[in-house]
Curated annotation (Swiss-Prot):
The lineage of its organism: Eukaryota, Metazoa, Chordata, Craniata, Vertebrata. Residues 323-332, 442-451 have a biased composition (Basic and acidic residues). The gene is nusap1. The keyword Ligase does not apply. This is Nucleolar and spindle-associated protein 1. The keyword DNA-binding applies. Microtubule-associated protein with the capacity to bundle and stabilize microtubules. May associate with chromosomes and promote the organization of meiotic or mitotic spindle microtubules around them. It is found in: Cytoplasm; Nucleus; Cytoplasm, Cytoskeleton, Spindle. GO terms for biological process: establishment of mitotic spindle localization; meiotic cell cycle; mitotic cytokinesis. Interacts with DNA, microtubules, ipo7, kpna2 and kpnb1. Microtubule stabilization is inhibited by ipo7 and kpna2, while microtubule bundling is inhibited by kpnb1. Active GTP-bound ran causes dissociation of ipo7 and kpnb1. GO terms for cellular component: cytoplasm; microtubule; nucleus; spindle.
Length: 500
């Protein structure tokens, strides 16, 4: 391949230069100027040296100009070292060193700097007078560099000597305390050259901890005492409850042949209604006596047990407030329902026969007698053992039970047999409700809130997860229905029949 001339190389385009570089085996992905230089250097190596010489001279002149400009700008600055401001740690000044040395050193440095600045000014003047000579600035630069390196080396030597002196003084005067009151840095380590952090004796530490701890025997004794205390308190409570139960059983001793009912089993029949008037059996004097006797018989131990509730569950509580308040007397259905557990109920024991409470007797149903006319309705409790015979009468029945038997003996539900149903009598009896008057509604239209047939409420209710989407078939059916309705309406209007 023939090498192109310099004029030809300069006249070529960028793409042609790239092709040429590729053929020569050079890097073609460069800028046009650099590529041209590379090609020239490759084909004509003599021109390369010339260009380098010219570049060197130009760079020298550039550096000289730069230096001269810097000297013009910074004639005032004494030192050429840029100090870091407050970033690193400040060097520890030894206060024993005299200030005179520091002053002499600084003065020496200052004089040197001043001398160098004077030299520079003289050199500047020389360069202005002799601009044509190229060798003079190179020599000046060399001199400057040497002077700078000498200054820096002197400063470094001074600093290093100062540091070594400081260390020696610290090692000798470890005991002497500084005037400021602070221990100098690393003084402690210098005083103890062979000291190392000693590991603690863990065996001794563990033994000390174990000695502090409580022994297992002592712990077991303490635990046993605590358990005994708890169990004794529980036993005391049990004993108290037993004693109270015994005292209650003593209080319930029978006065006569009729045994008082124990509260173990309660009858499921409704309790007796409380009479407003004072009963003849319970006079004020007798009540006082009973209170005294009950307080006298009660033991001190019973009071210790505290509050004892009569009802142990909310499901068995007496919720019939109408009996006490008398404000719901019209609600007679409440009395018919079976009673719940209450303190006012009569209990039944296995020894005594089960008592029965008679229903309230109407005046009309009783046998007509002039004595009974002004007597109120009474619920009567009968016992088979104490039923008075008609011969003896009222004299045989004494006020043994808390409820005194005042009325005459009537038929109980067991003894009275049910008769046949009399239709005429039931029809003649007055109705307990108001019968409906007027026309009845038709059976089909019994629903008050009839849903609209066109509404989608029922569909939405059924398919709330997957709503019903209107399809083409639905629309087709709707159109068919609309046509049918229109046809019916047209026929109706033609025949004179009103169609909805």
């Amino acid at each position: 391949m023939e090498a192109p001339t310099l004029s030809q190389l300069e006249g070529l385009r960028y793409s042609e230069l790239q092709k040429l570089a590729k053929t020569a085996g050079l890097k073609a992905n460069l800028k046009a100027d650099k590529l041209l230089k590379v090609l020239k250097a490759h084909f004509y190596p003599e021109s390369k040296n010339e260009t380098l010489d010219s570049d060197g001279s130009s760079s020298l002149t550039d550096t000289d100009e730069l230096n001269s400009s810097q000297e013009k700008e910074e004639p005032v600055s004494v030192s050429f070292v840029t100090h870091r401001r407050g970033r690193g740690r400040k060097p520890i000044r030894n206060q024993d060193t005299p200030k005179d040395e520091f002053l002499t050193v600084s003065a020496g440095v200052g004089t040197e700097n001043m001398a160098s600045s004077i030299d520079r000014t003289q050199q500047q003047n020389c360069t202005e007078s002799k601009k044509e000579e190229t060798t003079s600035p190179i020599i000046d630069n060399k001199h400057r560099k040497r002077s700078r390196s000498e200054d820096t080396s002197k400063q470094n030597n001074l600093e290093s000597t100062g540091k070594t002196e400081k260390r020696q003084k610290k090692a000798s005067n470890v005991t002497s305390v500084a005037s400021t009151g602070k221990i100098p840095r690393l003084a402690g380590r210098l005083s103890k050259p062979g000291s190392k952090p000693s590991t603690p004796n863990f065996k001794k530490l563990h033994e000390a901890h174990f000695k502090k701890m409580e022994s297992i025997d002592k712990y077991m004794e303490r635990k046993q005492k605590r358990l005994d205390a708890v169990s004794s308190s529980i036993q005391e409570v049990k004993m108290l409850t037993k004693k109270s139960n015994l005292l209650k059983s003593v209080e319930k001793t029978p006065v006569s042949d009729i045994k008082k009912p124990v509260k173990s089993r309660l009858s499921l029949l409704s309790p007796l209604p409380r009479t407003t008037g004072a009963s003849p059996s319970r006079t004020p004097m007798s009540q006082r006596r009973s209170c005294r006797s009950s307080t006298a018989s009660k033991s001190i131990l019973v009071d210790r047990s505290g509050f004892k509730p009569s009802v142990f569950s909310s499901s068995k509580m007496n919720v019939r407030f109408s009996e006490a308040t008398k404000d719901n007397e019209h609600k007679r259905s409440l009395i018919k329902t079976p009673a719940r557990k209450s303190s006012s109920f009569l209990a039944v024991t296995p020894e005594s026969e089960p008592r029965r409470i008679l229903p309230s007797v109407r005046k009309t149903e009783l046998l007509p007698a002039p004595e009974k006319a002004d007597k109120p309705d009474v619920n009567i409790t009968l016992n088979t053992t104490t039923q008075p015979s008609p011969a003896t009468g009222m004299s045989a029945c004494k006020a043994i039970t808390p409820f005194k038997f005042t009325a005459q003996n009537t038929e109980t539900p067991n003894t009275k047999k049910k008769g046949k149903f009399d239709l005429q009598a039931s029809l003649s009896r007055q109705l307990g409700y108001q019968p409906h008057k007027g026309k009845l509604k038709p059976w089909g239209e019994s629903k008050e809130n009839k849903p609209d047939p066109n509404s989608n409420v029922s569909v939405l209710k059924n398919n709330y997860k997957q709503p019903h989407l209107q399809t083409r078939e639905d629309r087709r059916n709707q159109h068919v229905q609309n046509r049918k309705n229109k046809r019916d309406q047209a026929l109706g209007t033609r025949r004179g029949v009103p169609v909805k």
